[in-house]
Amino acid sequence: MNPELIFKLASSLALVSWLGLAVSPYCAPWSPRVRLVAGYVVPLLLAVVYVVLFAANGMAGGGFGSIDAVQRLMAVPGLLTAGWLHYLAFDLFVGAWIAERAGVMGVPHLLLLPLLALTFMFGPAGLLAFYVLGLLWSRRKTQRLQA
């Protein structure tokens, strides 16, 4: 297995999936399928490749007990690629969850697009921004109901 090739293919697949999440509401007949594939099938596929890479490379003299041990893991190209797939899979899954929750909450998709971009680039920051938006959105809805 070539870590560089896996890195490029996985990154491309994740990018296409993020684009799918962004445009899915605008392609109505395909929307549920796009969200299923982009939000669940692709992250699971990335997870499978992650597990295979870890199994193929072992712990390579590293571990998770210290920054030094993690650095030794990341010095191995196959494990660095596995780490990248970890980010891709979880961030994409979180992005799909955000899109799903925002739809349930009635948040307009145009408000969601910057949050998806933020989650794509900076994972936890996008999740945090979504929680802030969710609080503001629910407060706004409550105020409308009381008016």
Which residue stretches match the model-derived regions?
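Loop-to-helix transition at the N-terminal end of transmembrane alpha-helices
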Residues: 30-52
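Short aromatic-rich membrane-water interface segments that cap or initiate transmembrane helices
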Residues: 1, 69-83
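N-terminal signal-anchor/start-transfer transmembrane helix
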Residues: 9-31
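Hydrophobic, aromatic-rich membrane-embedded alpha-helical segments
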Residues: 113-136
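Helical transmembrane-bundle signal
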Residues: 14, 18-21, 46-53, 127
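Transmembrane alpha-helix boundary signature
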Residues: 54-65
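Alpha-helical transmembrane segments of polytopic integral membrane proteins
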Residues: 16, 92-99
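Structural signature of hydrophobic alpha-helical transmembrane segments
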Residues: 5-14, 81-85
